[in-house]
Amino acid sequence: MTVRKTLLSLALFTSLVAQTACSGDLVLEKRLNPADTLRETTNRTVVPGTFVMTVKSVNVFNKMVFLNSEDSYLDRANVAVQITSAVAYNADIRFGGDFRKMVLNRKILVIGSAMKVGADLEQGIIVNNKDDYRTYIFVSRASNIFLR
């Protein structure tokens, strides 16, 4: 479990460094929808980019906010944008209201890094088998979130 957490931390750090290099105003040319994101992350690589999706559900767990592309986070087709509660708070200020309610059933564009993450009970995800992975897009700043 320690190796998994170390690899996840390293991948998250790499994605944060990649995001820091991007301005909040920069929108990369290639925009990935949830199906593209699932396909691009099959090799368990970190995929930085611009992602477009409609938020169908919002979950909060361990001070993290998950914006889901599917009604259930257990759906294997789900791609979740993961942001910290601090980023969600900054998004509340930026968009002038309760960000979690504002994005529900709306199309969003985010700049971040996507990767497959092994599902485990510590993350609050029910494990179906040992090859169970979920796809997350890590976004580190509210300025990297755009409503459409």
Q: Where in the sequence are the language-model features?
A:
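Bacterial N-terminal signal peptides that target proteins for export
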Residues: 1-8
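C-terminal motif of bacterial Sec signal peptides marking the signal peptidase cleavage site
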Residues: 20-21
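OB-fold single-stranded nucleic acid-binding module
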Residues: 24-148
